[in-house]
Each structure stands twice: as C-alpha cells, then as structure tokens.
C-alpha cells in the first residue's frame, strides 16, 4: 500500500487498543481492528438506551474508521487517537453511571405499581414520567433516589397500617375464640390441629426495612390483599369454632341467623320470631350451634 505507518505511530495505536480494553501485540494491529471497533460499539451501546437513560451515542467516529481499510484504517485511527480515547472513556463512565442508577429506577417503577390506590400516587407518577420524558436519569442531583425514598416511605406507612389492622383483628378474634366454652373443652392436641387447619397462627413479622424487603412483602401480599385477609378473619375463626363444636357434638346442626336491616320495633319482633322458629325446628334434630 502507498500508506506507511511508522513504528512510533503503531506504538501509539497499540496503546489506544490497550486503553479501550483490547490487548494488541506488535504486528497484530490490523487483525485486532475488528475487535477494537466491536468493543467501541459495545461501550457506546451501554452509554445510552431506553428512557430515562440518555440516548445511545452516535457512532460517527467509529463509522469513519470502519469506512477505511488496511493501513488507511490504521492511519484514520491514529489521526483520531485523542477523539477515540475520549469517547471510550466518556462512554465507559456514562455506562457505569447508568448501571449505578438504573436499579433504583426499576425499583421505583415496581413500587409505584403498588401505590396506585394511595393519595400521592398521581404526583409521584407524574414526577417519574417527567424523568423518563426528559431522559434525566443522570441529572445532578439524582432525581430518582429522592422519588424512590418518598415512594418507599409512603408504601411502608400504608403497609404498616394494613398490618396493624390485621394484627388488631387477629388479636380480637383470637381472644373471642379463647373465651369460647366449646373451644376450651378441647384438648391441647385438638386445638393445635384446628389452629393449623384453619391457619390461626399469629402472622409472622413482615420486614420492610429496605426497598427490596418492602417490594418482596408487597409482591407476596399487596395492600388490597391485606384488607381482604383482615375482612376474612371472623369467618376463619368462626369456622374453627364450628369445627370445635363438631368434635364435641358430632350431630350438632349449624344454623345461620338470617341477616336483616330492622327499622322499628315491629320488624324486630318479627325477626326474633323468625329466628326462634328456625332454631326450634333445628333443635328437634339435635344440638344447635349459632
């Protein structure tokens, strides 16, 4: 070829290879060029991406080098040494910053999905959407971390309220069951078996100290599910009480009292008469449990 690369130029080119992260021995410069260009493309691809990350950098310099071949390509690389080195270092730094901040962004999105029914959700969601629209993941100061902290605090308080309500309801139902005469007639083994069968063991503590623990807790049982579990407590304990009666009196008949909205004395008397008739009829067949 008419283009000659001097030993001094080759030394500088090999140093650039090393700086980019592609080892290169003497006389391997042309053979290692595809690996160098692939490495640069990889670095560029990690320096951007889907919002809220910055846009993927343009590859104008890489494409200019790729457009050449042979010694002309080496010369192009040599002439662009400082530019390529700066781009490589900049892309690597940006990629590291993206990798550092992106987990918090993903965690924010995951947690916001659990906050849809909470009052501040619209504000938090709007702020997250602004970060995404403006691709401001790497802005200084960090816009994601404070938003994540606010979302975590909101959800932690909401979950605590649901847990407190569940634990209070559990304690109330447990106290009522322990006062029940039929339940107390059972042996310890029978009570233990019914407790296990009807899932009446006290709920374990729920760890929410870190965003990851909070996420796991909500994924396992979200806010709405805690409400449902609390509402289901009376029926669970009542089922255990009925089972206790069944063990003591196998022929017992369970009677469901009809539910009504009573507006006056006359309706009350009519309802009481209806309930009395229902119970008396069932008593003819054996013991009755209400």
Enumerate the predicted regions with their spans.
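Extended alpha-helical interaction scaffolds
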Residues: 1-289
């Amino acid at each position: 070829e008419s283009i000659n690369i001097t030993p001094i130029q080759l030394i500088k080119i090999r140093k650039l290879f090393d700086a980019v992260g592609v080892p290169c021995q003497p006389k391997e410069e042309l053979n290692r060029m595809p690996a160098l260009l692939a490495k640069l493309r990889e670095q560029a691809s990690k320096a951007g991406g889907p919002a809220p990350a910055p846009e993927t950098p343009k590859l104008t310099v890489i494409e200019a080098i790729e457009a050449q071949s042979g010694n002309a390509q080496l010369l192009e690389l040599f002439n662009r040494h400082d530019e390529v080195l700066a781009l490589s270092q900049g892309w690597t730094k940006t990629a590291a910053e993206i990798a550092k901040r992106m987990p918090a962004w993903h965690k924010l999105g995951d947690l916001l999905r659990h906050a849809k029914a909470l009052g501040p959700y619209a504000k938090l969601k709007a702020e997250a959407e602004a970060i995404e629209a403006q691709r401001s993941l790497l802005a200084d100061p960090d816009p994601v971390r404070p938003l994540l902290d606010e979302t975590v605090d909101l959800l932690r308080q909401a979950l605590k309220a649901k847990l407190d309500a569940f634990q209070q309801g559990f304690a109330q139902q447990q106290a009522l069951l322990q006062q029940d005469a039929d339940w107390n007639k059972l042996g310890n083994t029978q009570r233990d078996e019914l407790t296990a069968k009807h899932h009446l063991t006290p709920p374990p503590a729920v760890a929410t100290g870190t965003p990851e623990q909070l996420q796991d807790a909500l994924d396992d049982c979200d806010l709405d599910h805690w409400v449902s579990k609390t509402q289901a407590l009376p029926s669970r304990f009542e089922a255990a009480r009925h089972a206790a009666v069944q063990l003591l009196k196998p022929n017992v008949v369970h009677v469901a009292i009809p539910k009504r909205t009573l507006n006056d004395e006359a309706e009350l008397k009519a309802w009481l008469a209806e309930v009395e008739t229902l119970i008396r009829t069932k008593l003819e067949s054996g013991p009755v449990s209400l």
